[in-house]
Amino acid sequence: MPISDKTKKRFAYNSSSISNNTDNSFIEESTKIVYGEEETTKTILHALNNSQERWDNYANSKGPTIAMGLEPLRKGIKNAYSRGIKIRYISEITPNNINYCKELMKMAEVRHLDNSKGGMAVSETEYIATAHLQEAKPVQQLIYSNAKEIVEQQQLVFESLWNNAIPAEKRIKEIEEGYDRI
């Protein structure tokens, strides 16, 4: 049974606090759940556009189809790339998403990790995550946070995953040569 918008709003968790950022101005820290394709897409693009140095992504095999298959997200990534943002992307590269991964590799450093689940992205100041990704379809709900401790924790999680992933070029070569991973 679908959850009504009224129920979603009533149960959505939103916690806020004030934090001092690096330029001595104060920002409101927030952690919340965002629902609906339009709102989640806006939130993803907001975080991507706010990135100043880095945009690190981790996603299951559907992630590249969303990043490159949905026009607003593809444009957002392309814009970040043109602004000089360092983009890194971890996904499970498969025969079904290999072309999306190749397209993504034009703008990002891409790595492969077997059995990837869900998805997340983290910049220097913001974090977003979702548990469910569908091929070339907008995200239905996600968690957003700009809380410093959460962002720092997720940066460490991403670095650990990145260090365990293999270069996309290696995985693509395996697929194209018919090598089957066990």
Model-identified regions with their sequence ranges:
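PLD/PLD-like phosphodiesterase catalytic module centered on the HKD motif
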Residues: 1-30, 41, 63-182
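Short amphipathic
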Residues: 31-35
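A short, well-structured juxtamembrane/interface segment
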Residues: 36-43
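Secondary-structure "cap/kink" motif recognition
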Residues: 45-54, 182
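A short, Trp-centered hydrophobic/proline-enriched beta-strand micro-motif
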Residues: 53-59, 87-89
